[in-house]
């Protein structure tokens, strides 16, 4: 089974900044789905299950690419594990949103969501993500997660190590420290 991991360093779904890569993801998802309508599962853990973020995902992938969009809410206990497992079983691609990376990884490990994502990846489900959803797969990630808690702006943190490299998201122009 071919495995695909698509990492989007930054951008905004709502303003269509990522439309070219979204189109690429949609094409892959449709191939994965075969004769069925493609199904995309949005994971908004890093944004603490922000529903407006999911609505932007749904609007883009449903209206532009005709993909069934769904969401897995886990931060506040809205969905049972069995319901989330059903959604993972249907997914042609999983899209991990941006936000607080360190919180997201801690939450995934605590709740078992990481195991579901790993199993989906192993069976050929396309995994993609933006910002926190992109950098989490790397050995080392340069993230501002601690700034949410009032600490320094950017620091190196250990990621999941699926990609043996280091990443810095949202890089446009080098800034002087």
Regions found by a protein language model. Give the residues of each.
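Flexible gly/pro-rich beta->alpha loop and the following alpha-helix that scaffold active-site loops
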Residues: 69-126
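Short, glycine/charged-enriched secondary-structure capping and boundary segments
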Residues: 20-22, 55-57, 108-112, 142-145
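N-terminal beta1-alpha1 cap of cysteine-dependent amidohydrolase-like domains
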Residues: 2-93
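Class I SAM-dependent methyltransferase SAM-binding "motif I" and its flanking Rossmann-like core
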Residues: 106-107, 114-176
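Mature exported/compartmentalized surface modules and terminal targeting/interaction regions
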Residues: 1-2, 144
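Short, surface-exposed connector motifs at secondary-structure boundaries
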Residues: 36-41, 99-100, 163
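Short glycine-rich anion-binding loops that position phosphate/pyrophosphate groups of nucleotides
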Residues: 11, 46, 99-102, 133
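Structural motif
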Residues: 7, 93-97, 128, 167-168
